[in-house]
A protein has these predicted regions:
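Glycine-centered short loops/turns at secondary-structure junctions
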Residues: 73-74, 152
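N-terminal helical cap/lid subdomain that shapes the substrate entry/recognition surface
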Residues: 1-64, 72, 83
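Asp-based, Mg2+/Mn2+-dependent phosphohydrolase catalytic module
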Residues: 68, 79, 83-182
Length: 182
């Protein structure tokens, strides 16, 4: 093992995670091998990596309510800045999300671009054959929301106020988007 500080310095601060998210290591095996090489740690199995990743995640239950509702109103998809290992581990990390999304999962490593850059949104829209005006993005990052808006998508920033994510506002935004006149 290694301390979180060592991992942060060797992997994240030096830009390796961003490179992985952009597709430089396009398989979980390649990602995990490079992670071990760069951080000078033993190579983790995908299950070990997923366990560590799960411990670092924060579940936002109210967002699941909004995702379920959105799936009743139209097609839903995930668009995430993450490497191949996360994509492969998603059924372990968030099986309820996978159940709702089905195959509608796009990760930055697949698209060769990262949020908030405009290109990732264009590639995601093209992948689904959807006009930007007919697409809605929810994200907790203002930069990602602005990136989506810059290509013509409707976007909502999920805010945290007094330690609580404003998921009621997210659900309302989903309903408002679905009810818009076409």
């Amino acid at each position: 093992g290694a301390s979180q500080y060592h991992l942060a310095r060797t992997w994240w601060a030096d830009g390796y995670e961003a490179r992985a998210e952009a597709g430089e290591w396009p398989t979980p095996a390649a990602y995990l091998a490079e992670f071990a090489r760069v951080t000078e740690t033993r190579r983790l199995s995908l299950a070990e990596w997923a366990s560590a990743r799960a411990a670092a995640m924060t579940r936002i239950d109210g967002s699941m309510v909004a995702l379920r509702r959105a799936s009743e109103l139209g097609v839903v998809s995930l668009l995430s800045n993450n490497p191949a290992a996360t994509a492969s581990a998603l059924p372990i990390l968030a099986p309820d999300v996978v159940e709702i999304l089905g195959r509608n999962q796009l990760f930055s490593y697949m698209l060769g671009a990262r949020k908030p850059g405009e290109e990732i949104y264009r590639r995601a829209l093209a992948h689904y054959g959807v006009d930007a005006a007919d697409a809605f993005l929810a994200d907790d990052s203002l930069a990602n929301v602005e990136g989506a808006r810059s290509v013509g998508m409707t976007a909502f920033q999920l805010l945290r106020v007094d330690g609580q994510f404003q998921t009621d506002a997210l659900l309302a935004a989903v309903e408002t988007f679905a009810a818009r006149s076409r």
